[in-house]
Amino acid sequence: MAAAATMAAAARELVLRAGASDVEEEEGPLGGGSGLQEPLQLGELDITSDEFILDEVDVHIQANLEDELVKEALKTGVDLRHYSKQVELELQQIEQKSIRDYIQESENIASLHNQITACDAVLERMEQMLGAFQSDLSSISSEIRTLQEQSGAMNIRLRNRQAVRGKLGELVDGLVVPSALVTAILEAPVTEPRFLEQLQELDAKAAAVREQEAMGTAACADVRGVLDRLRVKAVTKIREFILQKIYSFRKPMTNYQIPQAALLKYRFFYQFLLGNERATAKEIRDEYVETLSKIYLSYYRSYVGRLMKVQYEEVAEKDDLMGVEDTAKKGFFSKPSLRSRNTIFTLGTRGTVISPAELEAPILVPHTAQRGEQRYPFEALFRSQHYALLDNSCREYLFICEFFIVSGPAAHDLFHAVMGRTLSMTLKHLESYLADCYDAIAVFLCIHIVLRFRNIAAKRDVPALDRYWEQVLALLWPRFELILEMNVQSVRSTDPQRLGGLDTRPHYITRRYAEFSSALVSINQTIPNERTLQLLGQLQVEVENFVLRVAAEFSSRKEQLVFLINNYDMMLGVLMERAADDSKEVESFQQLLNARTQEFIEELLSPPFGGLVAFVKEAEALIERGQAERLRGEEARVTQLIRGFGSSWKASVESLSQDVMRSFTNFRNGTSIIQGALTQLIQLYHRFHRVLSQPQLRALPARAELINIHHLMVELKKHKPNF
């Protein structure tokens, strides 16, 4: 409709302008249609406003020309005036139709107006109702807030009353003394369970009353008297019971572990005394310390004394040293020596005392051993004595910590109050024994027993014996070192000329050393100690020097080598039975044995084959220096060597084998030496063959008499000893 109206207006405007234009054309330029041109008196013209109006018209026309309907009308060549009238007619028809429609719907419109008016009235009433409801809600909200505040205050008062009630209930329960408690404390024996239960209740009430009294609670005065009387009664009964148990320790042949177990069952008794009657608790502790310290001292003094009676009667003395000759003590007034002095240098089965099975074996019973006429070395007695000490000390320490409720330094002090006198007595006895002890193996075994017992005590979490173990080791180590140094000095000062007749067999001093060293090395391997290895190293040096001094007494080098080899082989064999193959002692004697064996083989081959050895060495030296031509003058010597070897080698080898087997006590060592000698002989003859293959000696007629090297090897194998 708007577009049509716009187009109609535009059409009317165009029609008007077109009409004006036509009129002007009809009138012509002269007006009136006369065709004459009359000058116009227009005066001063102001065309500014007209130009502005034309501009607006142009813009309006241009805008209308953009309309689709106008474009379509212009395109089809429609007469705008006719089209404008048609449009105007249509607009009038539409207007009239609209008026008719409005008149037809006037009743509906009036009804709609009435309905709208009624709705406005209803909405107004609802607005009033909602306003009243909002006002009511505001008042209700304030009432709810008031109720919430009142409820919170009531909750706080309730919680406060409940808290007060709970504390008052606890206070009353803690202060009230029930009749069951009174009856149990006064009438029940201390061994009954209900006495212990009510004693714990009494302890709790006494603690509660003390706490409340500190805070100024007046109600405590009402029950203080009753609780004090009950406490005194309970303390009296507990004191009598515990002292009775302590006195039972004093009965002869009493197994004090039984009363200790009974005391542990009622350990709360002492806890009660400690919290309610410290004077009585101290009295009981002092009585326990005094009683048990005397019992332990008496028991161990008796046990150690009876234990020493089953020691071997024959013990090492100051003259039983490694370097002391067997004939030194034989005199008119001298005591008979040990059945065999060598036994004090031999470990034998003594080392089993530090094995796990023997270490914690039951202790020795002296009277049983005496009835069976059994005797033991000192280390076995030491093990039994200290295992009993370890076992009882561990049990005592744990009992003290649990029953007397102590730990740390306090537990150590209480333990030493009980066991201190016993430990001191044991140390004095050990010190007295060691002052006259010359058995190094026994002392060394005792050291290792202590090291193992110290580990056991640590595993049992009993540190109270740590200082005692250190004191024992402080006695054992210096004595062990002193005995070892005495043996070193005895070997150093031994004069070979005073040892009697010379013999190439192993010397008894070297045998003592081998047994002694292997014993200490095998023990030391379990818990290595560098100081022990140093002392053994000093002893080894002195023994090696001693062997060389004795060997120097032989007139021939061959006898010297036989003596050295026999002694080195014996010492090496004994050491390898107990010590590790890679120990310093084994490696050292292995090197010495190999060196002397090689020298002996050369000495052994020298008489029968010395000429051959000398020629081969000279010839190889000439060949190496490039002077092989000088071998041409040795034909006669070579011929003699070939024929001499061919005629005598079998007899020489036979004599050599017999000589070796006579010289060496160890058949295996003798066999090894023979094998080494035959091997070296084959190598020597093979080298002789290589020398004769030189051009200067290749044409020698005597080469035909050479023994085939393979034939020689086959023949020499026949002389290999079989054991």
UniProtKB/Swiss-Prot annotation:
Query: Which regions form coiled coils?
Result: 107-127, 194-214
**Does the record carry Ribosomal protein as a key word?**
no
Q: Which residues carry this modification: Phosphoserine?
A: 355
Localization in the cell: Golgi apparatus, trans-Golgi network membrane; Endosome membrane; Recycling endosome
Keywords (A to Z) from UniProt: Acetylation, Coiled coil, Endosome, Golgi apparatus, Membrane, Phosphoprotein, Protein transport, Transport
Per the record, the GO terms for biological process are:
ectodermal cell differentiation; embryonic ectodermal digestive tract development; endocytic recycling; lysosomal transport; protein targeting; protein transport; vesicle-mediated cholesterol transport
Entry's Gene Ontology molecular function annotations:
syntaxin binding
Write down the membrane topology. Answer: Peripheral membrane protein
Top-rank taxon, per record: Eukaryota
Q: Name one GO cellular component term.
A: cytosol
Q: Which residues carry this modification: N-acetylalanine?
A: 2
Q: Chief location of this protein? A: Golgi
Q: What does the similarity note say?
A: Belongs to the VPS52 family.
Q: What is this protein's function?
A: Acts as a component of the GARP complex that is involved in retrograde transport from early and late endosomes to the trans-Golgi network (TGN). The GARP complex is required for the maintenance of the cycling of mannose 6-phosphate receptors between the TGN and endosomes, this cycling is necessary for proper lysosomal sorting of acid hydrolases such as CTSD. Acts as a component of the EARP complex that is involved in endocytic recycling. The EARP complex associates with Rab4-positive endosomes and promotes recycling of internalized transferrin receptor (TFRC) to the plasma membrane.
Q: How does it assemble?
A: Component of the Golgi-associated retrograde protein (GARP) complex, also called VFT (VPS fifty-three) complex, composed of VPS51, VPS52, VPS53 and VPS54. Component of the endosome-associated retrograde protein (EARP) complex, composed of VPS51, VPS52, VPS53 and VPS50/Syndetin. EIPR1 interacts with both EARP and GARP complexes and mediates the recruitment of the GARP complex to the trans-Golgi network. Interacts with RAB6A and STX10. Interacts with BLTP3B.
- Name of the protein in its database record: Vacuolar protein sorting-associated protein 52 homolog
The organism of origin for this protein: Mus musculus
Classification from the root reads: Eukaryota, Metazoa, Chordata, Craniata, Vertebrata
Whichever gene encodes this chain, its name is: Vps52
